[in-house]
Design a protein with these regions (language model features):
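Two-component/phosphorelay signaling modules centered on CheY-like receiver
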Residues: 13-31
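Active-site beta3 strand of CheY-like receiver
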Residues: 46-52
């Protein structure tokens, strides 16, 4: 097991279970929470290395919680695990301080590579997002450029 400490945040118990199973024996899960306010409290108290969280959560969404944590000096790296594929969410996530963006349907294939990349301060974006952006535009895109090594 690697010594990296991970805090999970998602309001869907099935997602928490799936992520826990994927990470079992590989990383230390220090806590799991189901809303943005609890995320802020536990991240401040437990000082994890990595946050794996959803965007859409009650009380405070993941993007707002990430902005708050970064503002108060949290050193935790952030990976969003979400169903949101549109560019506005992606840009907001990275603007808030995320380094990773994994689509929930690709959780089983993308989460571990995303964690490895993000823990090395690299950016990771699920491939379907990159493919869609490439289809829309023939010119280089900042999101595509950041994720090019993950295609």
């Amino acid at each position: 097991m690697e010594s990296h400490r991970i805090l999970l945040a998602d309001d869907e118990p099935a997602v928490i279970r799936a992520v826990t199973q994927l990470l079992d024996g590989k990383f230390e899960i220090v806590a799991s929470v189901d809303n943005g306010q609890s995320l802020i409290e536990d991240a401040s108290r437990l000082d994890p290395d990595l946050l794996v969280l959803d965007i859409s959560m009650p009380m405070m969404n993941g993007i707002e919680a990430t902005r708050h944590l970064k503002k108060v000096g949290s050193r935790a790296k952030v990976i969003f695990v979400t169903v949101h594929e549109d560019r506005d969410f992606i840009e907001a996530a990275f603007s808030a301080g995320a380094l990773g963006y994994v689509l929930k349907p690709r959780l089983a294939t993308d989460l571990l590579p995303a964690i490895r990349e993000v823990l090395q301060d690299h950016t990771f974006v699920s491939s379907p997002i990159c493919m869609e952006e490439a289809r829309k535009s023939g010119r280089p895109d900042p999101i595509l450029e950041a994720a090019r090594s993950n295609l």
